[in-house]
Amino acid sequence: MPTTELISYDEAQNSAFDNVLHGKSKESRGGMRAMMNKDNKAHAAAVDEYFQFFDNKKAEDEVEAVRQERTDNYASLTRQYYNLATDLYEYGWSQSFHFCRFAYGESFDRAIARHEHYLAHNIGIKPGMKVLDVGCGVGGPAREIVKFTGAHVTGLNINEYQVGRAGIYAEKEGLSDKLKFVQGDFMKMPFPDNSFDAVYAIEATVHAPSLEGVYSEIRRVLKPGGIFGVYEWLMTDIYDNDDLEQRRIRLDIELGDGIAQMFKIDHGLSAIKAAGFELLHHEDLAATDDGTAPWYWPLDSDMRYAQNLSDLLTVFRMNKWGRLVMHNLIGVLEACSIAPKGTRKTADGLAKGADALVEGGKRKLFTPMYLMVGKKPEKI
């Protein structure tokens, strides 16, 4: 088990802060409209709390103590990141906060759903099973997997705002009887031992201070014989932390995506085994070079892969030109006190992260979809 000493936080105090920050915006349609309905002072405090971990911390000056500080404060870092980034994610990407592979001629929406189906298939989720979604976002993947499998899914999320939005979307789609969303920390899950038939995590456990720690908690709440599947964000074996440019890419990904620290593939494999899982399968789904669209194409201004108007709009919102328009628009809205102060700084941080993701993807330094499937032993 990891020896990292984690800093505790006051859940009641955080809940009160989040309610002031978001107000009724969790009940809005999301995206830009929700962004305009934040409390200005609380938003500024969230911006300061998040960016203190990255401001004036350059790749060439990075020392282990800086990364350790982020790791110790992972809960605060992650919660404030999603307090700031959720509305921008919904505006620019979708309600499924993850990447995916693309088949020939496949639209963005279909590819996102297929990526979720593929994980559910690998885990063997069936109708009536009790399933846990670790780090569920606003519930996009959970809703899709419920519709695909007929299982009951419980979503766990440290961010109260996202939990509230996930519940609203589930009710809107008539899925409240199949979905439940719980606010909590995946390093100390609020569930009894042996609670779930299957567990999955889609690009979420990267926020953990210790992969072994979060995988161990997943094993604890999984029933004996149950299957856990994860799409993990990992640096590849090519990544060299002593290479300053590669380190900058990694640090920009961490800044733009609310990550305390990234690990390499061998670390992820060691962690899932050390947590007590029998590793059934592992594969870097981003490594397949079959001539189809790369996973990062929506961030890379490459219109040739767009299949419909919705894809074109996604590309425009996420590419450099769209981000430049958003940068200037938010600046005007902040100056007019329509958008809360710090919104542009947040958007610029996400943009820096997006550029690093593309660069890391092209250079094969990083994967957002390292698939690991593990089984909890029948007898423990």
Swiss-Prot record:
Query: Single GO molecular-function term?
Result: sterol 24-C-methyltransferase activity
Keywords carried by this UniProt record = Lipid biosynthesis, Lipid metabolism, Methyltransferase, S-adenosyl-L-methionine, Steroid biosynthesis, Steroid metabolism, Sterol biosynthesis, Sterol metabolism, Transferase
Name the UniProt record assigns to this protein: Sterol 24-C-methyltransferase ERG6B
What this protein is reported to do is described as: Sterol 24-C-methyltransferase; part of the third module of ergosterol biosynthesis pathway that includes the late steps of the pathway. The third module or late pathway involves the ergosterol synthesis itself through consecutive reactions that mainly occur in the endoplasmic reticulum (ER) membrane. Firstly, the squalene synthase ERG9 catalyzes the condensation of 2 farnesyl pyrophosphate moieties to form squalene, which is the precursor of all steroids.
Keyword check for Metal-binding: no
Q: What EC numbers are recorded for this enzyme?
A: 2.1.1.-
Read off the Pfam families from this record. Methyltransf_11, Sterol_MT_C
Family according to the record: Belongs to the class I-like SAM-binding methyltransferase superfamily. Erg6/SMT family.
Leader peptide range in chain numbering:
none
Q: Which Gene3D superfamilies match?
A: Vaccinia Virus protein VP39 (3.40.50.150)
* GO biological processes: ergosterol biosynthetic process; methylation
Pathway, according to UniProt?
Steroid metabolism; ergosterol biosynthesis
Q: Which InterPro entries match?
A: Erg6_SMT_methyltransf (IPR050447), Methyltransf_11 (IPR013216), MeTrfase_SMT (IPR030384), SAM-dependent_MTases_sf (IPR029063), Sterol_MeTrfase_C (IPR013705)
Which CDD domains does the record match to this protein?
AdoMet_MTases (cd02440)
Gene Ontology terms: cellular component: endoplasmic reticulum
Q: What else is known?
A: In Fusarium, the biosynthesis pathway of the sterol precursors leading to the prevalent sterol ergosterol differs from yeast. The ringsystem of lanosterol in S.cerevisiae is firstly demethylised in three enzymatic steps leading to the intermediate zymosterol and secondly a methyl group is added to zymosterol by the sterol 24-C-methyltransferase to form fecosterol. In Fusarium, lanosterol is firstly transmethylated by the sterol 24-C-methyltransferase leading to the intermediate eburicol and secondly demethylated in three steps to form fecosterol.
| Reactions catalysed | lanosterol + S-adenosyl-L-methionine = eburicol + S-adenosyl-L-homocysteine + H(+)
Q: What induces it?
A: Expression is positively regulated by the FgSR transcription factor that targets gene promoters containing 2 conserved CGAA repeat sequences.
Broadest EC class? Answer: transferase
Q: Which PANTHER family match?
A: HYPOTHETICAL LOC100005854, ZGC:194242
Does this UniProt record's set of keywords contain Transferase? yes
